[in-house]
A protein has these predicted regions:
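Conserved non-catalytic scaffold segment of RNase H-like nuclease domains
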Residues: 1-128
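A contiguous binding-surface segment within folded domains or other stable secondary-structure elements
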Residues: 132
């Protein structure tokens, strides 16, 4: 496949605690970044889902665990999205995004996580809504 890229193309996928975007959280985030020169970088984070109001780990819906194979116990020692948000934002910077079903679920879920982090006090400069 020949791609004529002028900016990096970032393919991404998430796994979550459930399908309710305002109430569920990302538990795994995977990126494959393809650069205009053809170089590729891959990154995956396992993320402890955090309830910012209750200040505790958010449980994974059992039906979500059946789909993604990730359990609460697997995430106990993982960082929260708050802790990886800066690194995630760096990966997104200056990239065009691509993914399966990304505009209906993955992108809104990612935007929700960034919004929670900003409400918790971390200042980020992430724009997932404006096409470049």
């Amino acid at each position: 496949m020949n791609l004529n890229l002028t900016r990096p193309l970032l393919f991404f996928d998430i796994e979550s605690t459930g399908l309710n975007i305002p109430n569920d959280s990302i538990i795994e985030l995977s990126f494959v970044k393809v650069f205009p020169d053809g170089k590729e970088e891959v990154k995956t984070w396992k993320i402890k889902p955090w309830d910012y109001e209750k200040q505790c780990q958010r449980p994974i819906d059992p039906s979500a665990s059946k789909v993604n194979g990730i359990t609460d116990d697997m995430l106990v020692d993982c960082p929260t999205f708050y802790e990886v948000a800066d690194e995630v934002a760096d990966w997104l910077k200056d990239s065009d995004l691509a993914g399966f079903n990304s505009t209906k679920f993955d992108l809104p879920m990612l935007a929700e996580e960034f919004e929670r982090v900003e409400l918790a006090g971390k200042k980020l400069n992430v724009d997932l809504h404006s096409p470049k």
